[in-house]
Amino acid sequence: MQKNSILFVTLSAFTVFIWYFFFAQPSEQSYRQMMQLQNTVAVSESGVNKFKNADLNEFQIDDIYAKEEHINIETEQYKAVLTNKGGGVLSWSVKEKNGQWVDLVFPESAPVMANFPNLTYKVVSKSAEKIVFEYASKEGWKITKIYNLSDLYMHNLNISVEKNAKTPFPQIDLKWGPGLGTDSKELKENISLTRALVYTAVKPNKLKKLKDNFEPASLCKWTAVDNRYFLVAFIPKNSMDFDKILFSRLEKKHPCSVILKAAEPKDVDKKDYSVNFYLGPKDYKYLKTYDLGLEKTVDFGFFGFLGKIAFSILVFFYKLTHNYGWAIIMLTTIIQILVLPLTLKSFKSSAAMKRVQPVIKDIQTKYKDNPQRLKAEMLNIYQSQKVNPLGGCLPMLLQLPIFWAFFTMLRNAYELRNEGWILWVKDLSAADQFMQFGSFNLNLLPLMMGIGMFFQQRMTTVTSDPTQRKIMYIMPVIFTFMFWSFPSGLVLYWLTNSLISMIEQYFIMKKDAITVKHI
C-alpha cells in the first residue's frame, strides 16, 4: 500500500504545486505600476486603448479645470463616492462580515462608469436612493445619468441622451477597470485572479472568459469583471441597445478592463440606455437568487459538479454547527467514508502484490537474461494469483477528482471569508497566523499538517528502500512549505484528511496482520 499512498500523495502535491506557481504573484509595487500605466488610456474597438470621441474634445478641454463635486452615499452594506466629473464612480466599498470595508475601485482606475471623464456634469438631485447628473452642451445635445440605488448590491443606471437634428449622438460607454479592488492582504494575487467575463444569451448559456473584444453584445446577457471573492457585472435591460464589449489588457500580467459600448441610435433624437449593475461579493446562494447565471462566476474548478455537491453539504453542516471549521471537518470525514471502499480495494491489491513479491524476485533473478520468458512467467503469476499490478494505483487515482473538487471549492468559497474556527483561527480564507515575529508569521496549522503527514507515512512506509524512506521525510516538508500561506480552511481539510487516514490505516494494517497469520 505504501507505494500507492506515496504515488497518490505525490500526484496530489504535483497538482497543487503546479497550480500554485502557475499563478505567480507580482509585487504590490509592480501591480500598482501596471494599474497606473493601463489607466492612462482606455479601451478601443481594436483593443488599443483610446476613446473615439473626437467630436467632444473641445467640450472636454473647457471642462478640465471645472470644480469637482463628490457625492457620498453610505448604507449598512456599502458606501460609495460618486463624482460630477463624467458622472462616474470614484469609490465603491462593500462591508464584510467582520465590519471591514473593501473598495472595489482601485484609486489608480477611478473614475469608473464615467461618460467622458473630463466633462463636468451638473448634480440635479442626490439622495441615498437616487442621484441625477446632467450635462448640456452648447451644440444642443444633453446627457442625463440617473443612479437608482438599493440597500444591497444590485443597482440600476439609466443614461438618457438627447440631441437636435444637426448634432450626432455622442458615443455612450460603460467602463470598469483596469482591475478590481480587493483587500490589501490579497493585492498581490489579485492580478492573476482578475477576469473579464461574458455570459452568453444563446442557450445553453455559457460563461466565457474574455481574451478579446466580443460582438455583437446582443449575444450576451451580461459582462463582468471579477476576482476570487468579488464581482462587478453590467446587465443591460435591453441587450440590443449595445453594440460591442471591448476588452483590454496591455500585457498578460496586467489587469484587464471592459467597456460596454452602446449601439448608435437610428432615426431618433432621444435614446435611453438602462443597465442594472451588481457590485458585491460572490456569495453563491445569494447570486443564484437573481436567476441571471451570476453564480456561475464562482469557480468550482474542472470538476465543478463535484465541487457544487461538496459545497451544498458544507453549507448543510454549517447550518448544524454554525461554524465552517467544524463543517469542513465533518465534510472531510464524510468524503473519507465515501472513498473507504477505494482505499480498502487499494490495500487489498497492494497486500496481494506484497505476498507474491518473493516469487517475482526469484523469477526476475532466474530469467534476467530472457526478457520474453520473464514477462510470460510474471503474467502467469498475476493470473494464477488473481493479482493486478495496477489494482493498487487506480483506486487512488480515482480519488484525485474528489480531492481536487474539494480543494478548489474551499479555495474559492466566499462563505469562508472572515469565518473563524477555534482559538487563533479567525479567518478560514486566510493563513491562520498563530504568532508573528517581525514580518514572519508562524502559521500553526501547516506545521500540524506536516507532522501529521510524517506520522501517516511512517505508519505505511515499512521499507528498507532508501528512496522511499527519503520520500517519507521529504513529502511532509514540501507540503508544509506549499501550504504555509494557503487559507486555513484548506489546511484544516488536509490536516483532518491525514488524521482520518492514519486511523483507517491503523485498523486496516491490524486486520491485515491477523489475516496473514491464517494464510
Curated annotation (Swiss-Prot):
Membrane-spanning segments: 6-26, 298-318, 324-344, 390-410, 434-454, 471-491
Membrane topology type: Multi-pass membrane protein
Keyword match Iron: no
Pfam families: 60KD_IMP, YidC_periplas
GO terms, molecular function: membrane insertase activity
Family label: Belongs to the OXA1/ALB3/YidC family. Type 1 subfamily.
Listed name of the protein: Membrane protein insertase YidC
UniProt gene name: yidC
